[in-house]
């Protein structure tokens, strides 16, 4: 059974999310099938550049599944990667720029890959119980994301478990 093993605050450098926008979680299959994540990784400079982004480090080489939630509006899912600020955006992709100093509340969810999404609903409470305040955007929507970091999420440990990062934007 997967469980939340760590909760912490992380401050981002100026960073650019590059990806594709979907109306459901099924976009992951399309991203992999079309090689779109590889395109983003390459245009961002590859794993070596992503691993060494100032103030972001090893979290840089990760697939990101952004989610926008607002009552009365359809779910938005944006799948892609964070890249250094001002990275060129390939044609057909969308981007969101985050300024330096953007804060995240991060939960590490440890368990079998097939179970790591089960405790996501507990993350908001764990983050607020940790003294952080989740902040909506200017339109009142709450953004969160899963960060599938390599190798934390992609290489199971000796028990066959991985760590999925689940993040909210916080003050």
Regions found by a protein language model. Name each.
Residues 1-171:
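A solvent-exposed interaction/effector surface
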């Amino acid at each position: 059974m997967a469980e939340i093993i760590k909760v912490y605050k992380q401050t981002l450098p100026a960073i650019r999310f590059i990806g594709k926008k979907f109306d459901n979680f099924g976009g992951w299959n399309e991203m992999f099938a079309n090689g779109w994540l590889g395109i983003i990784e390459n245009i961002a400079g590859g794993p070596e550049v992503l691993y060494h982004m100032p103030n972001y480090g090893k979290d840089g080489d990760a697939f990101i599944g952004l989610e926008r939630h607002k009552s009365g509006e359809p779910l938005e899912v944006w799948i892609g990667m964070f890249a250094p600020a001002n990275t060129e955006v390939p044609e057909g992709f969308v981007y969101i720029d985050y300024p330096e100093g953007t804060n995240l509340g991060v939960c590490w969810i440890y368990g079998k890959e097939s179970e790591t999404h089960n405790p996501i609903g507990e993350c908001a409470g764990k983050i607020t119980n940790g003294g952080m305040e989740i902040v909506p955007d200017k339109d009142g929507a709450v953004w969160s994301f899963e960060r599938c970091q390599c190798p934390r999420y992609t290489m199971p440990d000796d028990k066959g478990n991985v760590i999925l990062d689940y993040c909210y934007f916080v003050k």
